[in-house]
């Protein structure tokens, strides 16, 4: 209410806004035309829901302690359910609320599938060729190490960070090694995020993948 008064002290903005509801409280029912379009029963309850990661948590069973969701999209997010707020003194963990009445401590890396897209563009390769190259390369990518900060980085906090490749020589400069090295760099960034979560005594008994990157067989 205080914030609304600051925005416009001349009127009560509460009259201009919808009522506040919880993520799971029914606020209406599915209209027949929309139900037909979606292939769902007409009249089923509709609730406000929540943000993308909050809904991913529900969809991956991340509603109890011990489950960690790893979302592989443009950015990479790693989060877990907690019954109490998790406050990270270093500021790496976002202290989000969940949509199920608890909290959702979350780590975000800026470069996940976007790093692989940059590499695919560089080599003008499609997803099928990418998968074959990743399978053909050995672990360690022949010694090539990629720091995949193509868009800076949030975790660690390096907004002006740049992507780099190390360890190139005349023996390992093959397409499959470059691609493998990029995905290994992304993976180590996610691993670092998981370590930051578990360092706050967040248990990781089960990890569930979601997001576009989760469709990759490799």
Question: Over which residues does each language-model region extend?
Answer:
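Active-site beta-strand/loop segments that form the cofactor-binding cradle
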Residues: 17-18, 39
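Active-site core segments that coordinate phosphate-bearing ligands/cofactors
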Residues: 1-11, 26-218
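Domain-core and long-helix interface of multi-subunit machines
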Residues: 16, 22-25
């Amino acid at each position: 209410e205080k914030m609304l008064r600051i925005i416009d002290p001349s009127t009560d903005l509460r009259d201009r806004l919808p009522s506040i509801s919880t993520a799971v409280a029914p606020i209406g029912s599915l209209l027949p035309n929309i139900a037909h379009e979606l292939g769902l029963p007409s009249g089923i309850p509709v609730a406000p829901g929540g943000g993308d990661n909050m809904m991913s948590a529900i969809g991956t069973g991340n509603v109890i302690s011990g489950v960690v969701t790893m979302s592989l999209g443009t950015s990479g997010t790693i989060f877990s359910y907690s019954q109490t707020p998790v406050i990270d003194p270093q500021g790496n963990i976002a202290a989000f609320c969940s949509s199920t009445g608890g909290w959702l401590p979350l780590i975000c890396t800026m470069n996940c599938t976007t790093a692989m897209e940059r590499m695919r563009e560089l080599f003008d390769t499609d997803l099928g060729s990418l998968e074959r190259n990743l399978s053909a390369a050995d672990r360690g990518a022949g010694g090539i190490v990629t720091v995949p900060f193509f868009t800076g980085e949030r975790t660690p906090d390096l907004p002006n960070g740049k992507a780099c490749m190390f360890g190139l020589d005349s023996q390992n400069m093959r397409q499959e090694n470059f691609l493998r090295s990029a995905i290994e760099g992304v993976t180590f960034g996610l691993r670092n995020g998981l370590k930051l979560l578990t360092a706050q005594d967040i248990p990781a008994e089960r990890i569930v993948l979601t997001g576009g990157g989760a469709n990759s067989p490799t």
